């Protein structure tokens, strides 16, 4: 790094280390400064995402935890996903926005290390929560008579995810540094006593190896696995619909199963789409940062980062849009009313492996009245 001209601070260009992505300090020309109107617009956008991310995920967590009948495998994993999104909204958005605009770190050494560490942990937890949800849906639909995860399995899976996330993020606690090194040869008064926060790996090869590993661990690998699971689910449901008899209850259950699968798949697709621009930006910058013009770096990074952060709002939006129970409970939540079980009002949706479809043999032997009772008893409430 050329500290004399100081055209850039060292890069933090990995998928999870988005908030510490290198800042270009183009103090030689005012042309590189963002217009006030653009800064104001970005501030409003970031503020809106923070508010939606925090309130939406907090409401979703509170509603699911308060309603005992909603504590099934899928909803437990949804709570874990929302909690990780909540951490990202709190620990990432405000710090990243301020750091990118100011081009120097003002939050102290402890936050310099904790900020990227917590962000990396949160994103790892988010993507692997989606993996576990895909596995749960796969077993429920593809192999209903085989092994099916229960609530205890979900808690164990969540614990394993957090351990994996913490271990894979440890390099940020080790190599993240707060230093004034880039400013030591700068004579401008505006940059005196200023610090930057970035990762200082032993070598570029170490950094590139680690960032490439995280790219596969946090994005491409899990998403490929998830889409394979949902593709198999789609094929099975399509065959089941073609073979399904014309019983109204069967058609109702099939419709509800399809709706909940669309909701879960939509969350995955939104995650992949939101994170794609920042993933491409970081990958390109990691391997050939000269491609990105100095004056366009901060604006381009903020736009990519803001798009990625929208993913923190997706979970409660899709969950609420496709779940009438959540919409009703959300009204109670914002009206500060007590949550209470409303068995008569809840729609029934086969969300969890805790209560799966009864076998075809038992359905054939059951009378229409008994069949309807089985359906009502076996469907999950979310």
From Swiss-Prot:
Record flagged with keyword Kinase: no
Q: Which InterPro entries match?
A: GPCR_Rhodpsn, GPCR_Rhodpsn_7TM, NPY1_rcpt, NPY_rcpt
Could you tell me which residue ranges are on the Extracellular side of the membrane?
Answer: 1-33, 97-115, 175-210, 281-298
Tell me a GO biological process for this protein.
Answer: sensory perception of pain
Q: What Gene Ontology cellular component terms go with this record?
A: neuron projection; plasma membrane
Disulphide connectivity of cysteines? 112-197
Attached lipid, kind S-palmitoyl cysteine, located at 337
* GO molecular function (one): pancreatic polypeptide receptor activity
User: Source organism's superkingdom?
Assistant: Eukaryota
Topology check: give the Cytoplasmic ranges: 55-75, 137-153, 232-259, 320-382
Give TM segment ranges. Answer: 34-54, 76-96, 116-136, 154-174, 211-231, 260-280, 299-319
Describe its membrane topology.
Multi-pass membrane protein
Keywords, comma-separated and alphabetical: Cell membrane, Disulfide bond, G-protein coupled receptor, Glycoprotein, Lipoprotein, Membrane, Palmitate, Phosphoprotein, Receptor, Transducer, Transmembrane, Transmembrane helix
Which residues are noted as glycosylation sites? 2, 11, 17, 185
Subcellular compartments: Cell membrane
Q: Which residues carry this modification: Phosphoserine?
A: 367
The record's annotation in PANTHER family points to: NEUROPEPTIDE Y RECEPTOR, NEUROPEPTIDE Y RECEPTOR TYPE 1
Q: What's the stated role of this polypeptide?
A: Receptor for neuropeptide Y and peptide YY.
User: What family is this?
Assistant: Belongs to the G-protein coupled receptor 1 family.
* The protein, known as: Neuropeptide Y receptor type 1
Query: Per UniProt, what is the name of the gene that codes for the protein in this document?
Result: NPY1R
């Amino acid at each position: 790094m050329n500290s004399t001209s100081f055209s850039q601070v060292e890069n933090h260009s990995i998928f999870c280390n988005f908030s510490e992505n290198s800042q270009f300090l183009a103090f030689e020309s005012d042309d590189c400064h963002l217009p006030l109107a653009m800064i104001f617009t970005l501030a409003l956008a970031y503020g809106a995402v923070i508010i939606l991310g925090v309130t939406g995920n907090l409401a979703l967590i509170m509603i699911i935890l308060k309603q005992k009948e909603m504590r099934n495998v899928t909803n437990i994993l949804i709570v874990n996903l929302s909690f990780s999104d909540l951490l990202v909204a709190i620990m990432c958005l405000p710090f990243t926005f301020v750091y990118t605009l100011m081009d120097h770190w003002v939050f102290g050494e402890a936050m310099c290390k904790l900020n990227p560490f917590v962000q990396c942990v949160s994103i790892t937890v988010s993507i692997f929560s989606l993996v576990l949800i895909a596995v749960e849906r796969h077993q429920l639909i593809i192999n209903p008579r085989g092994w099916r995860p229960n609530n205890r399995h979900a808690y164990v899976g969540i614990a394993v995810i957090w351990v994996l996330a913490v271990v894979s993020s440890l390099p940020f606690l080790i190599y993240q540094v707060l230093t004034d090194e880039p400013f030591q040869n700068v004579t401008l008064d505006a940059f005196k006593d200023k610090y930057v926060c970035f990762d200082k790996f032993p070598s570029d090869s170490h950094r590139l190896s680690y960032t490439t590993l995280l790219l596969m661990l946090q994005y491409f690998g899990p998403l490929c696995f998830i889409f394979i699971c949902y593709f198999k689910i789609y094929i099975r449901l399509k065959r089941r619909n073609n073979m399904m008899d014309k019983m109204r209850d069967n058609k109702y259950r099939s419709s509800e199963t399809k709706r909940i699968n669309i909701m879960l798949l939509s969350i995955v697709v939104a995650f992949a789409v939101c994170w794609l621009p920042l993933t491409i930006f970081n990958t390109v910058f990691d391997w050939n940062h000269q491609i990105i013009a100095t004056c366009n770096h901060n604006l381009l990074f903020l736009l990519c980062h803001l798009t990625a952060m929208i993913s923190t709002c997706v979970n409660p939006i899709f969950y609420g849009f496709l779940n009438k129970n959540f919409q009703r409970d959300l009204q109670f939540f914002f009206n500060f009313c007590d949550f209470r079980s409303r068995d008569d009002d809840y729609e029934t949706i086969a969300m969890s492996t805790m209560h799966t479809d009864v076998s075809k043999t038992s359905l054939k032997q059951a009378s229409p009245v008994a069949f309807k009772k089985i359906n009502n008893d076996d469907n999950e409430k979310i």
